[in-house]
Design a protein with these regions (language model features):
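Short, contiguous alpha-helical
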Residues: 23, 32-44, 48-51, 58-101, ...
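A structural signal for well-ordered alpha-helical scaffolds and beta->alpha junctions
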Residues: 27, 40, 44, 81, ...
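Cleaved targeting-peptide boundary
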Residues: 18-26
Length: 176
């Protein structure tokens, strides 16, 4: 092999080795999922972007055919995220009727600003919980947190869709 070709082969191997990232851990994967559904735009819009600039009146608007409003969807996310977080932390949970409709229908536009603030706080608490959890706790909680993130992404998409129907969505925020 010619010296130049050998040097190029060694150099490319060294460059590839430097670009190699450490393998993902359960903690890093869960944090990535939490961040992308909370406040870091990636393949889809996170909740903080989906509700940004939405007024209480806009949050209460319901599309035809009985679909949920953006406010009802955000309230539902707050309810389930808070409830599961309380369970993971070993805290007592608020009373639940067992009727999932209640997790949407108890929304009141007067509480819109509080719903947005509390949802942001709950998402931050999840992130802190995952950052400080033991490996054993993460192994136990991983599937539940992953499911919560999937649930969040699903309803965030609905919020964006409702806003598009309403005409209150700014496509510059990530979804054209």
């Amino acid at each position: 092999m010619k010296p130049a070709a050998a040097a190029l082969l060694i150099l490319s191997t060294l460059c590839m080795a430097q670009d190699k990232q450490p393998p993902a851990t359960l903690r890093s994967l869960l944090l990535q999922e939490l961040h992308t559904t909370h406040n870091k735009a990636d393949w889809f819009v996170p909740i903080n972007v989906a509700v940004d600039g939405l007024t209480a009146q806009q949050a209460s608007w319901q599309p035809p055919a009985g679909s949920h409003s953006a406010g009802q969807l955000a309230y539902h996310l707050l309810f389930w995220n808070r409830r599961v977080l309380q369970r993971l932390k070993g805290e007592s949970q608020e009373k639940y009727s067992g009727k999932n409709d209640d997790t949407f229908n108890n929304f009141d536009d007067k509480q819109w600003a509080d719903v947005v603030k509390q949802l942001d706080e709950v998402m931050k608490e999840y992130e802190k919980l995952v950052e400080s959890a033991s490996d054993q706790q993460l192994a136990s909680w991983g599937a539940t947190i992953g499911t919560i993130c999937t649930h969040n992404a699903y309803h965030i998409g609905q919020i964006v869709y409702v806003r598009k129907l309403q005409g209150s969505w700014n496509p510059e925020k990530g979804v054209k």
